[in-house]
């Protein structure tokens, strides 16, 4: 499964000089949690909601540009990357999104931890369900061996008693 099959292709971006208050307002009005920061058609960083919340607490001015608070050197994937690789990058780097780049290193999409969860949830939901309750199946499977062991135990205990 490739990232290109599941990524969001229409990506809202901001520039490094976008004031953090504007980025915060835009994030909340659109319901996003991350923005790629793009300059000259290349991703130069990622800003997350938590970065903006920390900035709001630590900076006195809402005009501080996001390049002062963003995470530089973003972790990215290509559109041909395997989905499991993208998921591993998210987990290993403790991040919530990955900008998706084409072969020219230009932004073509984004994949988020929410996208990955939706894919996993869809796979789990698509699994066939048992036609019989699991308890009955398990009980039936162990019934005969347990009876055998119980009979042997009874025989041994009666031999010892005699």
Predicted regions and their residues:
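A short, polar/charged loop-to-alpha-helix boundary motif
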Residues: 53-66, 117-129
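Bateman (tandem CBS) regulatory domains
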Residues: 1-11, 62-74
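A glycine-centered beta-loop-beta connector
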Residues: 27, 35-50, 90, 98-114
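Histidine- and aromatic-rich ligand-binding microenvironments
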Residues: 19, 47, 51-52, 64-69, ...
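Cytosolic regulatory modules rich in charged/polar residues
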Residues: 103-108, 113-162
């Amino acid at each position: 499964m490739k990232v290109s099959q599941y990524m969001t292709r229409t990506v809202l971006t901001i520039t490094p000089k976008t004031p953090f208050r504007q980025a915060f307002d835009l994030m909340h009005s659109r319901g996003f949690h991350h923005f790629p920061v793009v300059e000259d058609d290349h991703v130069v960083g990622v800003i997350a909601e938590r970065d903006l919340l920390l900035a709001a607490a630590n900076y006195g001015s809402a005009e501080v540009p996001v390049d002062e608070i963003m995470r530089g050197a973003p972790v990215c994937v290509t559109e041909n990357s395997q989905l499991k690789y993208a998921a591993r990058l998210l987990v290993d780097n403790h991040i919530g999104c990955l900008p998706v780049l084409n072969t020219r290193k230009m932004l073509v999409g984004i994949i988020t931890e929410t996208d990955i969860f939706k894919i996993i949830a869809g796979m789990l939901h698509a699994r066939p369900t048992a036609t019989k309750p699991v308890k009955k199946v398990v009980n039936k499977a162990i019934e005969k061996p347990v009876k055998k062991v119980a009979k042997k135990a009874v025989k041994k205990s009666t031999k010892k008693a005699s």
